[in-house]
Amino acid sequence: MRVDDSVVTLQPSLSGADAHGTPAPANQLAEPLFYRRARGYVPRPVFLPKTEQNAPYVLGTGAELKATICLTRGAEAFVGQHIGDLENPATLNFYEEVAAHLEKLLEVRPEALVCDAHPDFLSTRYAEARAEREGLPLWRLQHHAAHAAAVLAENSHYGPALALCLDGTGLGDDGTVWGGELLFMFLLRGGRGIPLRGMTAPPFSYIAPVGAGLPGRMTLAGKHDARTA
């Protein structure tokens, strides 16, 4: 099976900070900051709260761009290797191969699936088809809430938190396109979102607004709205 290289940078270790919170020099202690997790770092778990020890095995199917999967086993979450954008049958086939390989490696069979709330993502369609085929429950998660939850879990923060999400676009809980919101998150109890003021978006493509890949157009749209408000 294909295995891509990981892409990381090193940052000063916060665990090596002094009593005043000043991080240790980068040449003394450093931790990897991932841009792309693959060779050498998969599968390594992100540890979840102890309360999740007896939780069901869950497969998170990710989104459409820079896709990967995540499989939980008790109080551990294993992020799959870098896959890429799900834009053609070959990439989708590799996506399914990665999911099957990780399940075999961890000796885990998912008992539930979590997918993006966007109905047209290929990862969502994969989750829907598999849930129907295997009789598994399927939960849908708003795109930016998933980003916020991942950051909180990676930093072992399980209490209440406010997360400012300035991602691209994602289908919101209210059926509109979100792309900047303040989310109240509580990993052990769920979360709710407060979108920032709406604005005009460029025309839609099949999957997402054109502005998702061309931020300059979103800037012009914001300037237009400010002038006409």
Where are these regions (language model features)?
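Short acidic/glycine-rich loops and adjacent helix/strand connectors
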Residues: M1-A229
